[in-house]
């Protein structure tokens, strides 16, 4: 493309790869004026020579890094969910066609983009993901120990604590039923279990320390059922929450609202959508379960009368989901208003 055409550039799409980026750009008439492949290390030097414009990229690995880098250069980066770029793909799938689709999607006026995360948010998100992986691995290790014991005809009561308390007694008292090799295997798995416990405890402690130093986390933890994990997880996911105009938008993003399938003026609602962050939604649902387990505390909360009313006429699982939705909406209101939760004031919930 000529130098003259490049000066008319209004939008660029980047298909981000591990080592190579593919760029496609359009001018204000929709004419293709840029089609280029660059190395990752040449990102800054390449964009320094381009006119400042909208730069779209899919929400993928390193998208936030690329976005921050381009913003420093004066561009307007837009991180787009992959499902929003798919309708713009023409022809076969290749890197240039993907970049072209991203460039076209980035020009849409009502496009819902992913909010750019700060480095602190990414660090906090990484901590949560490490902890989540460790917890999953610990669960898998415990289940494998149980499976090997069942293969020997030995069953243990449900729960990790029950297995921990009885494992060595089983290995000692029923040594005739367990071969020496199997005993060594189970001992090795138990050592893995102890190591994972230590890693999880250390990671959880680090998250708790961060929650005590972060003002937004402190205010979020004034909400019933919300502790260090939810507060830091929410800050890592949405920052100050200003990407949403109201609390119900945040609840919808979190997937805690009914799926809508309406046509012909008839509204049909189904199960919850389960969109957005599965991890954060799970934490809010777990918080709702904890509150449901302690009905003696309900009168202390501003939403206590509502909770007593719905729990008397709906299935418990529906009540838990509705309560998780309410907690998420309260959390967004707390995050954006700069206030703390008032046990006896319901105005924050209504936003």
Regions found by a protein language model. Name each.
Residues 6-26, 102:
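Gly/Thr-rich phosphate-binding beta-strand-loop-beta motif of the actin/hexokinase/Hsp70
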